[in-house]
Amino acid sequence: AADVIACENLYSGLVRRTPDGSLAPELCERWEVSADRLTYTFYLKDGLTYTASKGDPSDYAITAEDFVFAFQRMFLPGTNSPYAVEFSALENSAAVLAGQKPASALGVTAAEPLKLVFRLSSPDETFLSKLTLPGAMPCDEAFFDSTRGTYGLTSASTLSSGHFYLYNWTSSGLFLRRAASGNQIDSLRLVENTTSSGQSAEELINNEKCTAALDDSGTPTSLQSVSYSDTTWALLFNCDSIFASTELRQALGSAAASAVEVPGGGLFAEAKGLIPDGLTVDGIDYRQAAGDVRPAFGDP
């Protein structure tokens, strides 16, 4: 989606993913992980500032407090952030999301201006990787408050912490730029397909020379598509050994389904299959049409 592509280029977080798939420091110099893997400490680079629209410098420095504010805002009940579920391992996350504890109780603190500490209630082996998600990007609280509810909705209310900055924002899309460096792309034009021209995403990109276009029409295209999805946790069996028995797998699967307890706080929902609720095919909800495919006690 155009908004996700914009976020990934306008904002940088604590870490970044390299071309070979590994994680490397981005806005931080380094990080440390405790032996029990419940505490992550990041040491931010000194002298970093946000960039305003048109590439103008800003007076807003990037500090540990910006990440604290971003994560606390993520878990405010009124924010309804889709990224809260990704960071459910943070200490007190469910209670904060449910409004049972204040945002300050969330497991993220600024020990020093450039020292950020995350505290987890249980280990999450994918925690570092999740810090590359748009929801984990820094946000200056003073600037956020100054926008009076328009943060990120106009060029004037958008600050960049990434390699690109917002050059222009019109009704048809966004234009991002960065300083020229070698053979690297120094501009991105992101157009949302909301016109009545009937053009597909591929036609918009080819005819209007756009970098990316949002299109939910489902029209086949030879262009690369970028999508995102929620996470489904499932129980998988190695069918090459003792679990080659279908009856045994069904028995264990039904037992696990009946024993699972969905955590409260609104972060999780029970899965009735790999395809979640809300996915429609020709206007028909797939999950409702297919039903619950999980084996039940007493199935032959």
Question: Model features per residue range: what roles?
Answer:
Residues 1-8, 27, 54-60, 125-138, ...:
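A structural "hinge/loop" feature
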Residues 101-105, 112-115, 119-187:
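Gly/Pro-rich hinge or "lid" segments in bacterial periplasmic/extracellular proteins
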Residues 1-35, 72, 159-160:
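N-terminal lobe/hinge region of extracytoplasmic solute-binding protein
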Residues 15, 19, 46-49, 72-80, ...:
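Sec-exported extracytoplasmic/periplasmic mature domains
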